[in-house]
Amino acid sequence: MRVILQKDVINLGDAGDLKEVADGYARNFLFPKRLAVRANEGNTKAALHQKKLGELKREKRKKAMEDVGGNLNGKEYEILVKTGGGEKLFGAVTPIDVASILKKNGFELDKRKIEIAEPIRNLGSYKIKIRLAEGIQPTITLHVKKEEE
């Protein structure tokens, strides 16, 4: 079945793309979530127009993300955490914690864009990758230090 994507769908395409998908995938997943509509002549013309507008928006968003990425890349941040004696943390530092630190420093990012390679459960310095857009992945350094009581 030919469909026109209304929103970006991971592993399928971007909004405005014309795609061939299985009937069941379209009826059971894409249509109920309003991620796509059935492609017909009228929808196809409208989709081409929408795709052009979407490309302009994506270009603007990519330029904005390049600016943010340039400002973030190589920066160092510090987080104070409680420890259970020695170097072990109570719990772990999560992407939510990193997002809140970045928010305090003027960068509002979704926690899903923050990639922590392995769980941070010890004191020390860690490199954290932030996936802003395709090809834009600044790396920050997070210093995990003991909170003084």
UniProtKB/Swiss-Prot annotation:
Q: What does this protein do?
A: Binds to the 23S rRNA.
- GO annotation terms (biological process): translation
Q: What is this protein called?
A: Large ribosomal subunit protein bL9
Q: Which UniProt keyword terms apply here?
A: Ribonucleoprotein, Ribosomal protein, RNA-binding, rRNA-binding
Gene that specifies this protein:
rplI
**Could you tell me which InterPro entries the record lists for this protein?**
Ribosomal_bL9, Ribosomal_bL9/RNase_H1_N, Ribosomal_bL9_bac/chp, Ribosomal_bL9_C, Ribosomal_bL9_C_sf, Ribosomal_bL9_N, Ribosomal_bL9_N_sf
Question: Which GO molecular function annotations are given, in alphabetical order?
Answer: rRNA binding; structural constituent of ribosome
Q: Does the keyword Lyase apply?
A: no
